[in-house]
Design a protein with these regions (language model features):
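Acidic, low-complexity proline/glycine-rich segments
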Residues: 1-18
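Amphipathic alpha-helix face/heptad-repeat signature
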Residues: 28-38, 42, 68, 116, ...
Length: 173
């Protein structure tokens, strides 16, 4: 395919039938695409920590992080499909994820298990705040379906945060 053909295809309108206006499609699909980048970044960080956790609570943390990683990954396809369903375009590459993600990577050679859990807890809290902002945007544009999906993802992220908090909480005093 020629460069000119690629440029022409990029300019082609989707014209997906939806009850949302052009501004709503632009705003919501843009916000959901950034959320999707965050979800992929959080998924990989969660799996990174799942693979590299060690210590006396290895089994519990390893299984917890595996479960949480699966849950995060399970949300990625519905997010991307929602963007497409309303007439937008979404992520196309790892490079695009890297440019848009707000969740910070952790490439450290060693991270203590409690630091792993605390970092993921904070990342999930950040994700919840971003999802609430996107929910408000959906409400402003009357996109009930996207708002409804976000409510479920917020609930899942709150549960992940709760588990991570409880796993790092010190007992006593």
């Amino acid at each position: 395919m020629t460069t000119e053909a690629v440029k022409t295809r990029r300019k082609a309108s989707l014209a997906t039938p939806t009850g949302l206006g052009a501004d709503a499609v632009r705003d919501i699909s843009g916000a959901l695409t950034i959320l999707l980048a965050d979800m992929f970044a959080l998924y990989l960080k969660t799996k990174n920590f799942h693979w590299h956790v060690s210590g006396p609570h290895f089994r519990d943390y390893h299984l917890l992080l595996d479960e949480q990683g699966d849950q995060i990954f399970a949300a990625t396809d519905p997010i991307a499909e929602r963007v497409r369903k309303i007439g937008g375009t979404t992520l196309r590459s790892i490079g695009q994820i890297n440019r848009q993600q707000r969740v910070l990577d952790n490439d450290a050679e060693y991270v203590t298990p409690l630091d792993m859990l605390a970092e993921l807890r904070d990342d999930n809290l950040q994700l919840i705040a971003h999802m609430r902002e996107v929910h408000d945007l959906c409400d402003e544009h009357g996109d009930v379906a996207s708002a409804s999906l976000l409510e479920n993802w917020i609930d899942e992220a709150e549960r992940r945060t709760w588990f991570l908090y409880e796993a790092t909480r010190r007992t006593g005093g």
